[in-house]
Each structure stands twice: as C-alpha cells, then as structure tokens.
C-alpha cells in the first residue's frame, strides 16, 4: 500500500506539451489508492482533453470559475477545492504558471486554488532549455521553494524543440515516487523501526491437535498499519491468522508457537525503537508433544502442561531505549491486573481491554481500550473500530516518546 493511499490529491495541469503525460500520472495516483481531482488551465485543453482526465480520475475536471449546466451557472469554489486536498500537485508547471504562482497573478482557477490551498504543494517544472535556465525562471523556482512549495526537478533529455538539456518534466512514476518519499520523510516515525506481535499461538499436542485461543490478529494488524502510516518500518510477528497486510513498510514474519514468537521477537528487538506486543500468546504448552495422532480410546485424556516463555517480561528485562507496550485482556479485576503487569514486566505502557465490554476482544471489528502509561495515567477510549483504536494507541505512544 502506498503512503498516498486514501489521500486526496488535487492535480493542476498547465499548457505545456508534457501535459499529455498527465493521463499516466492520474492512473498511477489512482492505482496507488489516492483520490484525484483535476484542475486545468483553459489552454492546457489543447494538449489533453478533460474527457480523458475525468474518465481516468472518475471526477469532473475543473477549468473555469463558472460552468454552465443546462440553464444554470455553477461556481467552482476555489477555496473549497483547496481545502479538499491533502496535497496539491502542479504538473506540468510552465514558465508562465511559475511566474503567476510567484507573483500571485490570480487570473485562472488553478492559480486561485493554489493561493487558497492550505495543503503541501508540489510542482514539476516543464519547459524548453533556455526558458528553464533563464534568470526569471530561476528566480521563480527559488522563490516558490522559499514559500515552502516542493519542487520536483526537471530532468535532462530531448525537449519538444529538438534541443537536448534540462527542462523535461519528470516522468510520472518519478513524480509519484518523489511525493511518496517526501511525505514519508515528514512523518513522525520516519526512520524508526517498530516491532508488533499479533494473533494467537498454537501449541502442538500431536500432529493434528493444538492448544490455542480465539484471537484473530485483527488488532495487531491494524496497529501495524497505523505504525507504517506514520512512517515506521514495521516488523509484524504474526501467529496463525487469516488477516492480510499490503504495505511496503510492513515486513511480516509468520510463526506458529510461543517459542517461535519468542525467538522472532528477540531477533528484532535490538533494532527497534518501539515494541507493541498485542499477540495472545499461549501461557502453557504440552510438556511432551506426541509424534503420532492420539486415538480416542479412553474416557479421559491427561496432558501435562508447562509454562511458555514470557516474551513480554523477557523483553522488559533487556530493554534499553525501546518503548515497550503490552496488552492485558482481562475478565476480572481488570485494572488491578493490568497495573500489576505494567510494573512486573517493566513496561512503558499497557493497553487494557476487557472481554466484559460488548464489542471488544477477539474476532470482532471493534474494540474498547484504556491506555495506561508507566506513571499509571489512564486514557480511556470509547468503543471504536479496531483501525480507529490502532490510531488512538499510536497517538498515545507518540505523545510519550515525544515528551
């Protein structure tokens, strides 16, 4: 999943020959999961049609302040368009448009929207070589970047004039990659690694049977997504689960038993800044695992159990600068048990949820949690979707590590 997935991108197209490439650019942004709206300058329609772009973006294309629909005139509100966008991208950005952006020459819908936009603005210059290196253009580029806009540099290559040099608009894939990398670098967990555990563990009795629990792994998977969306590289150690994950920053490590999860966590722990152990790890396992399937011949079956390794406590003993978060799923004395676990296992925070709360716990799409830090300060959240709960948890962690 791309970092622009779910984001609203306003694409401004100006009158340059590179405008034909915006069809591919729109397709790439849509494929990355973004929602795209397009504003065209009137002259850019000579290079690519609004019909093409509206078909690809699945949204109407805007180009003038007013549009006629039968007998009615509709106003394209440039303020609303600017507020709608999470990011604005102007590509190609001609010398004419760069000058207007620099000086605030508000003579078309695109410039009016640019001047109203509250979001980050990217622009990809495109023009002939001599125009690109002219002092007027160089000044415009410098001033626009000084305003806080992000320039996607033009590249070296054959230009429409037949000359070879700088001024060629970056290729659509390079534009998308530039935006993705820039957005990632601005995120609060960019450059940090996070360890997350999810799902149950299965402790074998024989080749067929095992001791397990009802955990689906949904909560842990949602936390992994939330951490990745904050810029982290995530190591997701997952027990048996049907949950799927599609994010370039999430490395999934599949395990089955508590022992395998223990080893995987210890292998990654020294590299991470944050560890969130949400997995429902089995507390006990059969002392002896049979190599053949047990036959049903006796009225009872006795299985001797032994404790599994306590992953959370073991990491609490060796942690240095890591921020370590545990989970407490309780059925009675919830708060007391969670506080005891917080202290005994040397955690920085614990997330408490109770099976008594309707809609919380295993195999549901919702959860209700209380975040408790090492000073026992509590933040209780209402019942929410697990994706929303994951964001709440990550936001609380960010507050603590930034404090």
Which residues does each predicted region cover?
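A cross-family phosphate/adenosyl-ligand binding-site feature
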Residues: 1-122, 128-329, 333-403
